[in-house]
Amino acid sequence: MERARKLVAVYDDEVAALRPKDAEIFDAHVHVGTDIDGFVSTLDDLLAFLARDGVSRAFAFCLDEPDREPAFRAANDRTLESARASNGVLVPFARLDLAEQPVEEATRALDAGARGIKLHPRAQAFRLDDERLAPVFSLAADRHVPILIHGGRGLPPIAEHLRRLVDTYPAAQLIVAHAGIADLARLSEEFSGHPGVFFDTSVWSPLDLLDMFHRISPEQVLYASDHPYGQQPGSLFIALRTAQLAGLSEDQVRDLLGRSAAGIADGKPPALRTPPKGRRNIEQTITFARIHHYLAMATPLLWTRQRDTIGVLGLALNTCAERDGFVEERERIAELIASAQELWAMLPDIEDEQERLVASRYTFRLVHLADILAVTTSAE
């Protein structure tokens, strides 16, 4: 574990070097609570997670809680209580279930102090053409609060239906989570440059963010971790490395890290939209492409704790030995992967459940950092 901690600290330093001096960090997507999938984010853990990188504020909402029925009421109350106990760090959102009085629960939560709405069509099993969404968007427009909606895996195309809602309720600000990867090309066609629509950076693959920067105005992008699923320093490192490769200016990086989200929270007019800065193509050696491929294969195996994870990591590590230049980068990636392998091999022998969880999380962090380096090391 000590080797892993020291390696992670190196990338904390890299994040600090990439971050513009005195730039505010506002995390646009964190959770507090307990998910039915077993992930937990206590208030103390969340505040410590935010404090480690000097995050000033965060949009916070509950997970898919075991007691989510009826209407996420108890979970929303806990989110509000957490926000009150956070000394202004957490900006609370109310999570809704369209099957259980969504407008009534949103109204109740907003009256009690919520400052936004969270919708998760995959977890709550609804489509974006559901007629029950219209009154939710109407309420958000009337109350001048943002809606953050899941835009990641597990969804059919969503752009057309979201466009209708945004056109009907233009005063409702929309944040599409996970860079809108469920339908990114069409979402960008509909919303690139739109003053009331934003996309957050909470994804695993740097390729998703590079594609987003190619399609979306930089002023529409909000840094987000998706804690407890997203961890540091990978969450900030992926946002900053891809922004650098896409060619964002220092001022645009400041918008991404915090200024744009703070503007949403404080009710300020959005920044003037500028054209996308990203590139259509990236130059990458075959070696780094192969490393990325194997690490992408390993990621779901890590999540589900499959035995063959060690073998797939071995493929990535062996590829680092190819001699086609970029010696320093290959050595850095190899060190991360070797440390991840070492930790993964130790897991069965760790008896304490909490220690085993920490080691598992560090393994994922190391693999994520290695993949970010593999994708964002340009061969140009």
What do these predicted ranges mean?
Residues D130-V136, L155, H194, D211-I264:
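Ligand-binding grooves and catalytic loops that recognize ribose/phosphate and carbohydrate rings
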Residues I25-D35, L148-G152, A179:
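Histidine-centered catalytic micro-motifs
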Residues H29, L50, T79, A83, ...:
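Conserved, mostly hydrophobic/aromatic
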Residues R3-A4, V8, G116, D130-L222, ...:
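Catalytic pocket-lining loop regions of alpha/beta-barrel enzymes
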